């Protein structure tokens, strides 16, 4: 029996679970939310106990320090040497990494070099990996890539309609993200459908501060909403989602604060989405609390829902129908108003939601027996997938 720590760092959060392996027994788990925002929330659950604290955590490096301090303070571990493996979710693996890999100095540098494909994530991932390497030097560190699941996309889906040289010479293509989550929840949905996954057509909606949708056919990703970077696709907490690229040079020419292309990209990544439209917050909970009295918050909510509905419709066409639609991740699992708003616009497709199940259901089916497409809420478990990969690659 060994202890493995699975770490899932999002753009503004860090979710973790401590496992006893290979039994896959969860010893403790926690979540650090609102990293980089005021009043970060640190939650730790172990045994029958739960602890929650609120204080500012400015970056992912300090979040790692808080996590490890909590493990010792709460006696989840006596010594850090008990932790023999650490698995890290990394968003962008490009065309270099198509499977999970043990961290070496070369691998860490490649993760950093791929930051152009995930500017909000890979730098934070790399900072977290380095912090763990310094604090847990004897543990085997493994990187698990969000992009790996999407390597099954056909070329017609991942290529952009640009001259071929930009793909062959510069690897400009769609890579996607959240692959570990999309893979896990599609497998769980197949179980709920009672069908072999090879016979299923499933749309998975990973909706958190970052959000993406994937069309999964026969257990394989055939299209996904994020693109060359996680900036593409639906509207998100601080990200625009899809935009007309002609806006970029127009803004550079007309806004003196945006001096170059990188300035525009930074604005679209860090100051847009829910935060940019509402002017209040990147957190959906804050938007929902304000939308009945604040017109900008109301608009942000409506735009957010609109973009997700459009991608669901698109993937119903890509799959030629679907067996199931799955909601997962922070907003998808927990926000009744968001699910209700999205599903209310999909009735033409024969999707019927049971209002009572939607309000009270935290896991399982929330559609009616007559719904042509089953609708599930499935808590994602990227951490379990990560822990399994660490166990397989341990020294």
Swiss-Prot record:
Molecular function GO terms recorded: acetate kinase activity; ATP binding; magnesium ion binding
Cellular component terms per the entry's GO annotation: cytoplasm
Function: Catalyzes the formation of acetyl phosphate from acetate and ATP. Can also catalyze the reverse reaction.
Biological pathway: Metabolic intermediate biosynthesis; acetyl-CoA biosynthesis; acetyl-CoA from acetate: step 1/2
Entries under Pfam families matching the protein: Acetate_kinase
Residue positions binding Mg(2+): 8, 382
Quaternary structure, from the entry: Homodimer.
The name this protein goes by in its record: Acetate kinase 1
Top enzyme class: transferase
PANTHER family for this protein: ACETATE KINASE, ACETATE KINASE-RELATED
Keyword Phosphoprotein: no
Single GO BP term: acetyl-CoA biosynthetic process
CDD domains: ASKHA_NBD_AcK_PK
This enzyme's EC code(s): 2.7.2.1
Catalytic activity: acetate + ATP = acetyl phosphate + ADP
Cofactor or coenzyme needed: Mg(2+); Mn(2+)
Keywords from the UniProt entry: ATP-binding, Cytoplasm, Kinase, Magnesium, Metal-binding, Nucleotide-binding, Transferase
Binding site for substrate: 89
Gene it is expressed from: ackA1
Species of origin: Lactococcus lactis subsp. lactis (strain IL1403)
UniProt lineage: Bacteria, Bacillati, Bacillota, Bacilli, Lactobacillales
Binding residues annotated for ATP, in chain numbering: 15, 206-210, 283-285, 330-334
């Amino acid at each position: 029996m060994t202890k493995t720590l699975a770490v899932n760092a999002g753009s503004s959060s860090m979710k973790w679970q401590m496992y006893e392996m290979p039994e896959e027994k969860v010893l403790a788990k926690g979540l650090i939310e609102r990293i980089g925002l005021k009043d970060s929330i640190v939650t730790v659950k172990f045994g029958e106990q739960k602890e929650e604290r609120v204080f500012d955590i400015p970056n992912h490096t300090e979040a790692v320090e808080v996590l490890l301090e909590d493990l010792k303070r709460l006696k989840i571990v006596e010594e850090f040497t008990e932790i023999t493996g650490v698995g890290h979710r990394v968003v962008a693996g490009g065309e270099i990494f198509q499977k999970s890999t043990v961290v070496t100095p070369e691998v860490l540098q490649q993760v950093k070099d791929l930051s152009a494909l995930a500017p909000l994530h890979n730098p934070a991932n790399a900072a977290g990996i380095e912090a763990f390497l310094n604090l847990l030097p004897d543990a085997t560190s493994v990187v698990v890539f969000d992009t790996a699941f999407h390597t099954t996309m056909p070329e017609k889906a991942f290529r952009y309609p640009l001259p071929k040289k930009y793909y062959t010479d510069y690897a400009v293509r769609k890579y996607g993200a959240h692959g570990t989550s999309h893979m896990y929840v599609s497998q769980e949905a197949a179980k709920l459908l009672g069908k072999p996954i090879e016979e299923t057509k499933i749309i998975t909606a990973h909706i958190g501060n970052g959000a993406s949708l994937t069309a999964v056919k026969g257990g394989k990703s055939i299209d996904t909403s994020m693109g060359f970077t996680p900036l593409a696709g639906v509207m998100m907490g601080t990200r625009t989602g899809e935009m007309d690229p002609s806006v970029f040079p127009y803004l550079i020419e007309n806004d003196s604060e945006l001096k170059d292309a990188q300035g525009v990209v930074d604005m679209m990544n860090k100051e847009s989405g829910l935060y940019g439209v509402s002017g209040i917050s990147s957190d959906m909970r804050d938007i929902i609390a304000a939308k009945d009295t604040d017109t900008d918050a109301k608009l942000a909510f409506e735009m957010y829902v609109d973009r997700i509905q459009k991608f669901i419709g698109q993937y119903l066409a890509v799959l030629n129908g679907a067996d199931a639609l799955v909601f997962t991740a922070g907003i998808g699992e927990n926000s009744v108003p968001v699910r209700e708003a999205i599903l209310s616009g999909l009735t033409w497709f024969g999707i019927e939601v049971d209002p009572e199940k939607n309000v009270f259901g935290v896991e399982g089916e929330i559609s009616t027996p007559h719904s042509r497409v089953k609708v599930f809420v499935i808590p994602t478990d990227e951490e379990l997938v990560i822990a399994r990969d660490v166990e397989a690659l341990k020294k």
